[in-house]
Amino acid sequence: MNRETVGSGTDRRTFLGRAGIAAAGVATLGALPAIAKADAGGITPGDVEILVAAEIAEALAVTTYTNITRAAFFANLASDDQGYIEAARQEEMSHYLLEQSVTGKSSPFTTFYYPADMFSSARTTLNVLVSLEDAFIAAYLIGVRQFSHDDLRVTAARIMGIESDHRTLARVVAPGVAAQDGGPIEEITGLQGVAESVDPPNNNGYERTLGWTKIGQAIAALLPVADKDAAEKAGFDTSKPYTFHPFTPVLPNPLGEFHSFKG
């Protein structure tokens, strides 16, 4: 996954077609909960397109964090660093279920592909993880711009804040990687392709939009991870697919749970 894939109109149309997102704009409107219909105009096909793209991203995030917890280097992390990863897994699953409750649809993509040394190399894993979080942050900011419903805009901002936490915490974990696992890792390369020092781990004054203004740009960035043909073109290991397995999440603190779309 890199920024070179972003903006391909043909790839975006192919991806949307295979995901069935265009049909979802009409097919799911009748099944949406009351909150999605609160405004006179209701939820729009554009809203559904963003939400289904977000579901794909969250399914990918859950799959990524799940397999990080199974990686050999994970066992050698400090307990608090392990806790960051485990909590992020729960949070991403909660995001997925919330979005699914609005669309009435499951993610159309549930199998994902990574570089060959993903989960065996801590450096590769953290670079990919931060790249994904970069993409998720920018994608939710598109939702903030483009959702037709105020409650959905605010919810996108609330989720984006958590994705920002995850990006920072991945950078916190990097120096704690054990020497036997290639640590300490002092630089992380995210989606912009620039190696950035992990000191400080919270190195953004403002979240990065990546210049994205349309959800198709986020979809194009995720294409090599979610689509086998695109993964092969990107040089990813398609012989070892990873499957999304939903579960019932337990969030770390009741005060931080989703109580309503109103906040």
Locations of regions flagged by a protein language model:
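All-alpha RGS (Regulator of G-protein Signaling) helical domain and cognate RGS-like helical scaffolds
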Residues: N2-D11, G20-A24, L29-G263
